[in-house]
């Protein structure tokens, strides 16, 4: 996993040290190289989990999401060049750096083994996303959109945090690998339905 995360992080100094006229082509071309590395590294044809470390791993569900995230960066760079071509060089590089930061956070989110780490990384994506919406949004209502995005995300994330704490107190772990080994029969109760609603609400709020 480090062979994907570290090159992605190194795109940030590449952005700031590149010539202003070549920053787009440099970052886009190197991000395509990272895409090829990720395609070879994360390609899985079965459901067996690929362990990279005690904190990060991928399976047949997280691998496609991670590859999709990595492929989105060069596509976003290609799609947004015309939109911010009149911006200053500093603003262009800041915009690219925020996109790279967002990609790194999402890669770590989809490959996290601990649910609490997944929660922290998932909510950390709020910061670069909020800055991109409020600073480079195309509509005049971008400030209101950023404000709504912030409050809706916070409202949805608090029940998710409470649900994770409840699961930790009940089962004694939030490790996804260990939770998958729990084969004890579970009888549906009203509290389990509330926990399910609290977990799903944080993701449903971010869908728009």
From Swiss-Prot:
Topology with respect to the bilayer: Multi-pass membrane protein
Subcellular location: Mitochondrion inner membrane
GO BP terms: electron transport coupled proton transport; mitochondrial electron transport, NADH to ubiquinone; mitochondrial respiratory chain complex I assembly
Region forming the signal peptide: none
Single GO term (MF): NADH dehydrogenase (ubiquinone) activity
Superkingdom per UniProt: Eukaryota
Catalytic activity: a ubiquinone + NADH + 5 H(+)(in) = a ubiquinol + NAD(+) + 4 H(+)(out)
EC number: 7.1.1.2
TM stretches of this protein: 23-43, 60-80, 93-113, 114-134, 147-167, 188-208
Keywords from the named record: Electron transport, Membrane, Mitochondrion, Mitochondrion inner membrane, NAD, Respiratory chain, Translocase, Transmembrane, Transmembrane helix, Transport, Ubiquinone
GO cellular component: mitochondrial inner membrane
Location, primary (coarse class): mitochondrion
Alphabetical list of PANTHER family matching this protein: NADH-UBIQUINONE OXIDOREDUCTASE CHAIN 4 (PTHR43507:SF20)
Similarity comment: family membership: Belongs to the complex I subunit 4 family.
Function (record text): Core subunit of the mitochondrial membrane respiratory chain NADH dehydrogenase (Complex I) which catalyzes electron transfer from NADH through the respiratory chain, using ubiquinone as an electron acceptor. Essential for the catalytic activity and assembly of complex I.
Subunit organization: Core subunit of respiratory chain NADH dehydrogenase (Complex I) which is composed of 45 different subunits.
Annotated protein name in UniProt: NADH-ubiquinone oxidoreductase chain 4
Organism: Phodopus sungorus
């Amino acid at each position: 996993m480090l062979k994907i995360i570290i090159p992605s992080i190194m795109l940030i100094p590449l952005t700031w040290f590149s010539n202003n006229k070549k920053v787009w082509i440099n970052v886009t071309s190197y991000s395509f190289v990272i895409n090829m590395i990720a395609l070879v590294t994360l390609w899985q044809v079965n459901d067996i989990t690929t362990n990279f470390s005690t904190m990060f791993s991928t399976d047949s569900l997280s691998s496609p999401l991670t590859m999709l995230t990595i492929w989105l960066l060069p596509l976003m760079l290609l799609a947004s060049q015309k939109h911010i071509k009149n911006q200053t060089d500093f603003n262009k590089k800041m915009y690219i750096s925020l996109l790279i930061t967002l990609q790194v956070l999402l890669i770590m989110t989809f490959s996290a083994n601990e649910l609490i780490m997944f929660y922290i990384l998932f909510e950390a994506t709020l910061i670069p996303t909020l800055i991109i919406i409020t600073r480079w949004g195309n509509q005049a209502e971008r400030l209101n959109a950023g404000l709504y995005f912030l409050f809706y995300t916070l409202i949805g994330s608090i029940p998710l945090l409470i649900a994770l704490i409840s699961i930790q107190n009940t089962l004694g772990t939030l490790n996804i690998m260990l939770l998958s080994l729990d084969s004890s029969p579970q009888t549906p109760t009203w509290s389990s339905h509330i926990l399910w609603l609290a977990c799903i609400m944080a993701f449903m709020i971010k869908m728009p």
